[in-house]
Swiss-Prot record:
UniProt name for this protein: Ferredoxin--NADP reductase
Entry GO MF terms: ferredoxin-NADP+ reductase activity; flavin adenine dinucleotide binding; NADP binding
Source species: Lactobacillus gasseri (strain ATCC 33323 / DSM 20243 / BCRC 14619 / CIP 102991 / JCM 1131 / KCTC 3163 / NCIMB 11718 / NCTC 13722 / AM63)
Enzyme class: oxidoreductase
Reactions performed catalytically: 2 reduced [2Fe-2S]-[ferredoxin] + NADP(+) + H(+) = 2 oxidized [2Fe-2S]-[ferredoxin] + NADPH
Cofactor: FAD
Amino acid sequence: MEKYDLAIIGAGPIGLFAASFANLHGLKTISFDALDEIGGQINMLYPQKNIKDIPAFPSIKGKKLVSQLLEQNINTKFILSHKVKEISFLENENILVDKKYEVKSLLIATGLGAFKPKTLPLSTTLDVNQHIHYSMQHPEIFANKKVAILGGGDSALDWALELANTSDVFLIHRRNEFRGLESSVNKLKSLKNVELLTPYLPKDLQLNNNRMELVLHKVGASQDFVTKNVDEILVAYGFKSDNRQLRKWGIKLDHNLIAVSQKMHTNLPHVYAIGDAITYPGRVPMIALGFGEAQIAISNIMQDLFPEKTMTFHSTSI
């Protein structure tokens, strides 16, 4: 039986920072992630994305952010390709994780949980599927090509800005208004090699001479169609999340997210949660906010486990 002070489920940016902050306070920590690499959704889907809302970084790529967070985790043990399936409570109030790891506290930092991309709602062939993408791990494959990007959120806008450096881009959204940053929209509108097509939905997709013919239907206009010839398609429709495992453990959810107190405590003893997995009034899904939640959770875990200790809450304490 392996014993730890803290187990963290999720090795994305928020989980990584929580682990390093736990190390700072001397907690023996183990981290689990279902993916086969550290970094969570950012490393898996958006490693080249420029993140612009991290304090002190005007812009930092997702992969670089993960790398720097990992540098802080010299004492954390990581177990990858491991989806935690079972937790139970022992007589000594410790938590048994998957019948092998005994921990004093548990911190959930799983983001939206198991995620699958929302797929393009068109009938396609195997040949066509080779040109449809749901992430941009390797932007070089889009260079010097005509690329259609479907979606209206920050990911779609970020991808369009990135690919506009090397490609001709069609950004297609079902509404006239985009959900992402207005500054990104304005920048795209100023680029000659970017065309914004709104409000349009994909209607048909065919492969002809190794180039795709994408037929678009204008929303609200029964006979208004546009055809664009493209080499590659990037779909940014978001993800379907699955937190059924949390319900199985008895964790209280609110609209499929974990309900927490001001201390980031769940309804279960010694179980905390942070990041996009949680909800409370006024919360917004931002990485910087998740970092703060990690500090709140670890500080309260320390007080929970070691109430007799005088806490130094952060490295800048006098």
